[in-house]
């Protein structure tokens, strides 16, 4: 009876995750038992599961931090806000994908199952409190990501991207586990994050070469999920070859989940090696901001350009991880990631809509879009300007707060690189916007000349995601203070 009550108590701490599990089971049951599948029901079940999970998470807000399942999971505000961000990404990505799936005639059930399972893995990864749970949750997230990227099995580019993603992902997981083994051995056989710190103190191994080896391997393993340079090789190919809604989903959820995990791993087990991991992350941030933004200038594909742009963006996020909670670094990182979700998903919603009408992804083919679809052109322009960090859009205030926290922490060189590369990013975003707004007939491509808008009824779902993301991307600076205050409340 005591064990039952303990299980019931621990289960209540993962109630948002249980809602998603119930939604997964319901989808599987309907798909396997019903001959005539009503697609709208599948969307309704998956979207309702995500919204209910968000609601359950918000009801648990400000509760005392708790450890569940014998130390495997921890619930606190810091973990929960990352879980909220992952759920928000998934909720916005489902309506963004509806029209694409219908037009490409992909299997809807499997797509939604993979989305929900990836979300579930990301949520468990955010709350994981020991090395084994971190690895299992990460693999749950990763395996479903591989399946999503190769969802269009008949597409050669998708198959190529999935193969690269799978091989490099498997290698990075092996490297991560090797780093965990060094951490496990150095701490005297501990796997819980806080107990590892105590174990390192007891064994006097907190400044040993073994810890530095563990730090190096774990940084490489987590770096693959964050995709900073030089761990970025998979990103452009996967972005270009995968279905666009999948790219939109993975581009934000992978970074949110990996950032949550990286923050806890670096901040707790490597507490005594803060100088070393700060140096490692500074190198990654500098390489990411410079290489990502410079290579993005040369791209001709919108999705490849956004891939390199995301590499630069993760460099900005790493600044917040380095600063930590002493100077508001975590709060600024969370705030910027919230804005990044809206900016990035809004951009991808526009790309999905344009791609379905024209069948092209080439940047040159966007020339003159404003003359045919001013709403889509303006939405894309606003999201790109926000990604570039132009005032008074949300991206500007997010970057401003992030850079200010880095400057206060003494990261002058890192912030200077961030400012310079932000100017570079504005250049290639403005180059696209100039193409969108051109009105000269000789520059308008045949794709735009033959552009057709589908009836509102068939694309209202993607327009819903687009409107939400565009509004969130253009939030004025007056909204920054309450958002930052909420983010600061999450610090552990």
Swiss-Prot record:
One of its GO terms (molecular function) is quinone binding. It is a multi-pass membrane protein. The chain crosses the membrane at residues 6-26, 39-59, 81-101, 106-126, 131-151, 165-185, 209-229, 277-297, 305-325, 336-356, 377-397, 400-420, 464-484. It comes from the Eukaryota. It is found in: Plastid, Chloroplast thylakoid membrane. The keyword Thylakoid applies. The keyword Signal does not apply. Keywords: Chloroplast, Membrane, NAD, NADP, Plastid, Plastoquinone, Quinone, Thylakoid, Translocase, Transmembrane, Transmembrane helix, Transport. InterPro entries: NADH-Q_OxRdtase_suN/2, ND/Mrp_TM, Ndh2_N. GO terms for cellular component: chloroplast thylakoid membrane. It catalyses: a plastoquinone + NADH + (n+1) H(+)(in) = a plastoquinol + NAD(+) + n H(+)(out); a plastoquinone + NADPH + (n+1) H(+)(in) = a plastoquinol + NADP(+) + n H(+)(out). Pfam families: Ndh2_N, Proton_antipo_M. NDH is composed of at least 16 different subunits, 5 of which are encoded in the nucleus. HAMAP family: NDH1_NuoN_1 (MF_00445). This is NAD(P)H-quinone oxidoreductase subunit 2 A, chloroplastic. It comes from Phaseolus vulgaris. The gene is ndhB1.
């Amino acid at each position: 009876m005591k064990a039952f009550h303990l299980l019931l108590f621990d289960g209540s701490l993962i109630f948002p995750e249980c809602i998603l599990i119930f939604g997964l089971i319901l989808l599987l049951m309907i798909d396997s038992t019903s001959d005539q599948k009503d697609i709208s029901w599948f969307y309704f079940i998956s979207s309702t599961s995500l919204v209910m999970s968000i609601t359950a998470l918000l009801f648990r807000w400000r509760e005392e931090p708790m450890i569940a399942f014998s130390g495997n999971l921890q619930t606190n505000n810091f973990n929960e806000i990352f879980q909220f961000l992952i759920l928000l990404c998934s909720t916005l990505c489902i309506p963004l994908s509806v029209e694409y799936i219908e037009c490409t005639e992909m299997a809807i059930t499997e797509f939604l199952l993979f989305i929900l399972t990836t979300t579930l893995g990301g949520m468990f990864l955010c709350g994981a409190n020991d090395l084994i749970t971190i690895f299992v949750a990460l693999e749950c997230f990763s395996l479903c990501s591989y399946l999503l990227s190769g969802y269009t099995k008949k597409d050669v580019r998708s198959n190529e991207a999935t193969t690269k993603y799978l091989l490099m992902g498997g290698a990075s997981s092996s490297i991560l586990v090797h780093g965990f083994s060094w951490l496990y051995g150095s701490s005297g056989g501990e796997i819980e994050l806080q107990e590892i710190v105590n174990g390192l103190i007891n064994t006097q191994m907190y400044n040993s070469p073994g810890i530095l080896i563990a730090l190096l391997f774990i940084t490489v393993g987590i770096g693959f999920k964050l995709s900073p340079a030089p761990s970025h090789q998979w990103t452009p190919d996967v972005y270009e070859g995968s279905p666009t809604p999948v790219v939109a989903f993975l581009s934000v959820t992978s970074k949110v989940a990996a950032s949550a995990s990286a923050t806890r791993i670096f901040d707790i087990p490597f507490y005594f090696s803060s100088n070393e991991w700060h140096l490692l992350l500074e190198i990654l941030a500098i390489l990411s901001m410079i290489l990502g933004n410079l290579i993005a200038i040369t791209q001709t594909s919108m999705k490849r350009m956004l891939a390199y742009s995301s590499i630069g963006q993760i460099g900005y996020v790493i600044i917040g991880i380095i600063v930590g909670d002493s100077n508001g670094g975590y709060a600024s990182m969370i705030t910027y990631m919230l804005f990044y979700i809206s900016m990035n998903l809004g951009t991808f919603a526009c790309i999905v809509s344009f791609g379905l009408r024209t069948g092209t992804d080439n940047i040159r083919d966007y020339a003159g879009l404003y003359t045919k679809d001013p709403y889509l052109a303006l939405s894309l322009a606003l999201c790109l300007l926000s990604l570039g960090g132009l005032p008074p859009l949300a991206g500007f205030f997010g970057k401003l707060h992030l850079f200010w926290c880095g400057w206060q922490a003494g990261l002058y060189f890192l912030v200077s690189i961030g400012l310079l590369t932000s100017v570079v990013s504005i250049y290639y975003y403005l180059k696209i916007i100039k193409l969108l707004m051109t009105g000269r007939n000789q520059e308008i491509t045949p794709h735009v000349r033959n552009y057709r808008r589908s009836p509102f009824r068939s694309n209202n779902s993607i327009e819903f995601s687009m409107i939400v993301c565009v509004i969130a991307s253009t939030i004025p600076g007056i909204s920054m203070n309450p958002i930052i205050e909420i983010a600061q409340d999450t610090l552990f």
